[in-house]
Amino acid sequence: MKLSFNNVAKRFGDLHVIEEFTRDIASGELVALVGPSGCGKSTLLHMAAGLEKPSSGTVAGDGQAIRGPHPERTLMFQENALYPWLTLQQNVALALEFQNIDKKKAAEQAAVWLDNVKLKGFEHYYPHQVSGGMRQRAALARAFISQPKALLLDEPFGALDALTRMTLQDALRDLIRQQGPTVVLVTHDVDEALFLADRIFVFSPRPAKVLKEFNLVHHEKTHDLSEFAATRREILCLLGIHAEQDEFAKNIEGVGV
């Protein structure tokens, strides 16, 4: 699904969240949105999902204006949002049941998808009985089971430890390669953006506008991101992070004199 944002702006009352934003995201492309907290990245996702309407401008999927939620566009949050009274298999199957697919068939497909995310044998466990990483694997299975054309990810791994996060990034990349959805990823983790994305949009503080766009599509990437050191530093500088670190280092040096 091609996602198109045309002169999109968003206000909440007097709060100007997004300045005019115009970008096309090609079918099958993965774009990461990076920027300060509260700058409007998640709001862009919600508009693509049909949960929010732009104050001005248009958001479209394959040329059709997005006017509300649709199974073709799946939104996944940092919180796994699994129902605690349902097993992992039942949670995953629910995505198909909402589309009026037979309960037995939905359960069979859910078992297949749990196997795809390495949760075979945990189908009948409840969310509280497994780790946070396993819950997020189940949430990934639920996001992919309906084979969405667009996958909208709002910091899906932000609450996980570094090792689990890297493992799930690998799992996500494998699933994307299998299904080929368009993906928009909101993240505060620059390394995650560099590893997963074809393009990265770096946003300013609110009202959000794109400070710079980075094209990474021709790179075959591993978690060793040393070849992206210059790009990483530039992104951090755009976010003001290195400037703060350099100032902190100067202050520490001054204390030792």
Language-model regions, residue ranges each:
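Hydrophobic anchor residue at the start of the ABC signature
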Residues: M76, L140
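The feature captures the beta-strand-to-loop junction immediately N-terminal to the Walker
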Residues: V34-P36
